[in-house]
Amino acid sequence: MSSNLGKEKDCKEKDPKVPSSKEREKESKASGGFGKESKEKEPKTKGKDAKDGKKDSSSTQPGVAFSVDNTIKRPNPATGTRKKSSNAEVIKELNKCREENSMRLDLAKRSIHMLPSAVKELTQLTELYLYSNKLQSLPAEVGCLVNLVTLALSENSLTSLPDSLDNLKKLRMLDLRHNKLREIPSVVYRLTSLATLYLRFNRITTVEKDIKTLSKLTMLSIRENKIKQLPAEIGELCNLITLDVAHNQLEHLPEEIGSCTQITNLDLQHNELLDLPETIGNLSSLSRLGLRYNRLSAIPKSLAKCSELDELNLENNNISTLPEGLLSSLVKLTSLTLARNCFQSYPVGGPSQFSTIYSLNMEHNRINKIPFGIFSRAKVLSKLNMKDNQLTSLPLDFGTWTSMVELNLATNQLTKIPEDVSGLVSLEVLILSNNLLKKLPHGIGNLRKLRELDLEENKLESLPNEIAYLKDLQKLVLTNNQLTTLPRGIGHLTNLTHLGLGENLLTHLPEEIGKILFFFFFNVSFLFV
């Protein structure tokens, strides 16, 4: 390679602003995917997690938390110095790649403003990584890399691509996430060998009819753009396995989506969807369907034909009922989220509809009763969230929920907990905050696996002595009650790491509590009388 590479002129444009990790993955928790907030399963490129949620981002796993960058950052040198140093490194890498005839070139995170045109000499390359740079354009010479299979361009400031890229007949993966594209570059539609296309977090408003030319696509991610509709031609992508259109402005889906029968993951969360086509029932391979945060008022009956569905998230829509028998037909469903809708009662369908459910989230609805026997066949139900409903009592068979591990009944109108709570022997987390409880049953002492017990904002006047049997308890929240004394046995809870006693009527503590003062952070304030 010519030594003229060292004389490449430095670009003097300002460094573009790169969105923070919080901005890129703001949603969710939940959240996931779909309830853990959308987890976009993108492959990792060297040194970078190519993922969402978390989804989401979240990507965020519906569901489904995200990591924090704790990297120590050294002071930046003067801008001019950085550019010269960056170019020198690039030249060194290009020369090394040519001399070693390497098929892989990683130029990520080099603060590159302009890729040297001499890159065209590296025709042996099959992988080129340019993510996390400061590129505003690509030189046409990249089109000379006719053996490229992978081209990673995420986290730059690209607004277009050169037409010469249509020479890349072998390209299978193109990553354009986190750029400044206002449209899908026309050359992308001519890359007919593509199997994976990432366009997440751009400014794209339209998907053209030419998308049909990318018939080999198995993964298409166009989440976090400004797309208002998908063309009917999307139905010609018959090899699609994952379609991620979350965080856009879709109001409807084309009926032709039903032709994409290989899809297993369909993420439509955070759009403006008003309805779903009946043809969605043709997606016989569908295992994950994310519809949280839309404007749906009904679910088509045809969804019952999606018998492979494992996860269904309908959080934050306007749904008040489900088609009768829908859940019973989804024989592989393990995770169901119906939170933040308009349900006034449990879905019609009887006990069989929950026989495979592991996690059920009905939070923030208007449900006033859990029907007797509704979980009689729910042998694997481990997580139930009924927070923020209108429950005044619990069903008589409450004590038969023996597989329950996490139970959230917060923010209801419960006045008592049945004595047969003692039957919930697998319970590890019990949330009863914001209710009207005046006392706890003695059977609470049988929950030997309990790690967290939250009783904040009730009307408790005392605690049963049996609470001393909860030896695994790590968190006990009793804040905002009417307690005047504590049982002496509380001193036996040596695994506690958090004890909340604030806003009660306590005038003294039992001597035994001194045994645990050295083992945990003591969060307490007194209201003396």
From Swiss-Prot:
Pfam families tied to this protein: LRR_14, LRR_8
SMART domains in alphabetical order: LRR_BAC, LRR_SD22, LRR_TYP
GO process annotations (BP): cyclic-GMP-AMP transmembrane import across plasma membrane; intracellular signal transduction; positive regulation of Ras protein signal transduction
LRR repeats: 99-122, 123-145, 146-168, 169-191, 193-214, 215-237, 239-260, 262-283, 284-306, 307-329, 331-353, 354-377, 379-400, 401-424, 425-447, 448-471, 473-493, 494-516
Cross-referenced InterPro entries: Leu-rich_rpt, Leu-rich_rpt_typical-subtyp, LRR_dom_sf, LRR_domain-containing, LRR_R13L4/SHOC2-like
Statement: the UniProt record of this protein carries the keyword Cytoplasm: yes
Bias (Basic and acidic residues): 1-29, 36-57
Keywords (A to Z) from UniProt: Cytoplasm, Leucine-rich repeat, Nucleus, Repeat
GO molecular function: protein phosphatase binding; volume-sensitive anion channel activity
Keyword Chaperone: no
Subcellular location: Cytoplasm; Nucleus
CC annotations in GO: cytoplasm; nucleus; protein phosphatase type 1 complex
Chain segments carrying region Disordered: 1-87
UniProt main location, coarse: cytoplasm
Similarity comment text for this entry: Belongs to the SHOC2 family.
Function description: Core component of the SHOC2-MRAS-PP1c (SMP) holophosphatase complex that regulates activation of the MAPK pathway. Acts as a scaffolding protein in the SMP complex. The SMP complex specifically dephosphorylates the inhibitory phosphorylation Raf kinases, stimulating their kinase activities. The SMP complex enhances the dephosphorylation activity and substrate specificity of PP1c.
Listed name of the protein: Leucine-rich repeat protein SHOC-2
Organism: Gallus gallus
